[in-house]
Regions:
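A short, N-terminal "cap"/entry segment at the start of jelly-roll beta-barrel domains
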Residues: 1-32
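Conserved short histidine dyad/triad with adjacent acidic residue
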Residues: 21, 36-51
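Short beta-strand segments in beta-sandwich/barrel cores
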Residues: 45-46, 63-68
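Glycine- and acidic-residue-biased ligand/ion/polar-headgroup-sensing regions
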Residues: 53-65
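Structural motif
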Residues: 64-66, 73, 89, 99
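Short acidic-glycine-tyrosine-enriched beta hairpin
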Residues: 72-86
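Ligand-binding loop in jelly-roll beta-barrel domains
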Residues: 86-109
Length: 109
């Protein structure tokens, strides 16, 4: 299967997971996995949440920002991956003046 994100419509989600501002996403989902190309606008956040029944892999394609992971804050930049296993909490923060673009995969347990 080939997923062509150029052909998938972008959906804008205000206050995603209780976060600030908005995240735009191009998504594919089936019963086992969600695959997303996401964009956090400057100043936007993905709200702090715990993964129950899934994990998440985030690969930064453009920009940089911060990850909150189990109470620890760390910087993340283009080319790096953040992994949040099931049962752990995290948030992604774009604290810059440029879009933060990332690829995310959420396999369902």
């Amino acid at each position: 299967m080939i997923l062509d994100f150029k052909q998938i419509e972008e959906t804008v989600m205000p206050n995603f997971k209780g976060g600030e501002k908005e995240m735009a996403a191009k998504m594919y989902a089936d019963e086992k996995t969600r695959i997303m190309l996401n964009r956090l606008v400057p100043g936007a956040t993905v709200g702090l949440h715990t993964h129950e029944g899934s994990s998440e892999i985030i690969y930064i394609l453009e920009g940089n920002g911060k990850v909150l992971y189990n109470g620890e804050e760390m910087r993340i930049e283009k080319g790096q991956v953040h992994y949040c296993p099931e049962g752990h909490e995290h948030s992604l923060i774009n604290d810059t003046d440029a879009d933060l673009v990332f690829f995310a995969v959420v396999p369902q347990q």
